[in-house]
Regions:
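Conserved phosphate- and dinucleotide-binding cores of soluble alpha/beta proteins
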Residues: 2, 62-216
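N-terminal active-site beta-alpha-beta segment that forms phosphate/nucleotide-binding
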Residues: 2-89
């Protein structure tokens, strides 16, 4: 990621600095994806260098993992051998009940896995542009799909109200990612469960009723 090309960079750095007091020596931290998270990792690296602390990171994306590997104070862990003390991530949208749309960066499965695996909370770093009254106002819903099931999944999504399906490429897990538009359908936990029941769906970008703490 080219840091100089990140939009609203200074605002995102200010957000990133708000979680620095959560970092302690020896912790295992789940790390999401996206530009705000990328900048937060850079700020955490500065803190680790200054304090001579070390942490274990469990990144949700290959891009964040590569960034972490560049710092000698960060060890890359996994969910088999490590337990996450706390996590942080960004969001594409957040509603009044702290439900989220995530996955625009194609890392939604591992992001959700981190959030489900943390012992405490996940800090969600968001600026004012991410807040919406109703999920789906600004972004389509990302859905991660086993590649050979794309056509079948698309047909099944249309049966439950999808009006537009856009192929967006591949995830770090070598699955396909599609963005799905629903009209006259609430993007909520009920819909997330419906989508997950479709054979071939790996995960959805709906994050409903998770233990999160909003940082804004």
């Amino acid at each position: 990621m080219d840091v100089d090309k990140i939009e609203h960079k200074e605002e995102k750095i200010a957000l990133a600095k708000k979680i620095l007091d959560k970092v302690k020596d020896g912790q295992t931290i789940g790390i999401g994806s996206g530009s705000t998270v990328y900048l937060a990792v850079i700020e955490i690296e500065k803190l680790l260098d200054e304090k001579n602390w070390s942490i274990t990171a469990i990144p949700a994306s290959d891009e964040i993992e590569e960034l972490c590997k560049k710092n000698s104070h960060i060890k890359i862990g996994n969910l088999v051998e490590n337990e996450i003390d706390w996590a942080f991530d960004g969001a594409d949208e957040i509603d009044e009940n702290n439900n989220l749309i995530k996955g625009g960066g194609k890392a939604l499965f591992r992001e959700k896995l981190n959030m489900l695996s943390t012992n405490t909370t996940t800090y969600i770093l968001v600026d004012n542009t991410k807040f919406v009254k109703k999920l789906g106002e600004k972004h389509l819903l990302p859905v991660e799909v086993f590649p050979r099931a794309l056509n079948y999944v698309a047909d099944e999504l249309r049966k439950i109200g999808a009006t537009e399906i856009i192929y967006k490429g591949m995830t770090d897990n070598n699955n396909s990612i599609i963005n799905v538009k629903f009209e006259n359908t609430d993007l909520d936990e009920k819909l997330a469960k419906q989508i997950k029941l479709i054979t071939g769906v790996i995960e959805t970008g709906l994050f409903c009723n998770f233990n999160i703490t909003v940082v804004k």
